């Protein structure tokens, strides 16, 4: 799927965990899809040597995928997106799941049992702050109704976070001069639990009765990033060097108290 001009996207997960649908602000580059696993088998036999092509056998769906970008706002309306990326489900070592409702000009879609697998905090000079999201879901459904009850309230105004302040330090050494691009990326490495069974496979006749993934395991998490800096005459002597176990501090926003703030420890660069 590809987003159009009349885009509406809701998540049923709010900061208070009460499952009220909340409308998200996203850029037009929203995309989502789901494919099926095609297993093939040979048709060629002793008596039918001409059957060179293998036949298809579809029984299960792969996990669905989605991708969108949300702006960083001065208001706290969209903090839920960051929380779904970062926070563990209460009392567990796994992630919260949620539902996405997507309205396009001519149809509506729903992604069930969504989980965010990748989030990139985008910091670019002359651009507003943004958060890029990628994720997976168990099932993509077409032609469903948008949630109309109990919608989460949004602030009356939306103020995008400008980058009036950008500071970076690595191992207590400031790198502010010449910085033009910074990104911080959190990867949630998940694996969908096996869901192909003989009994269920016998009941598969079409897409509606296919087997879909339902549960996943969080295998590991990786936090990485990059810093773009123009080459200057007094460039730091750490160029083309590496260090481990050092702190990295990044602040980007309208001031050093607003926007994206990272105080990372035990980093390697």
Model-predicted regions and their roles:
Residues 1-269:
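Signature of extracytoplasmic/envelope-associated structural regions
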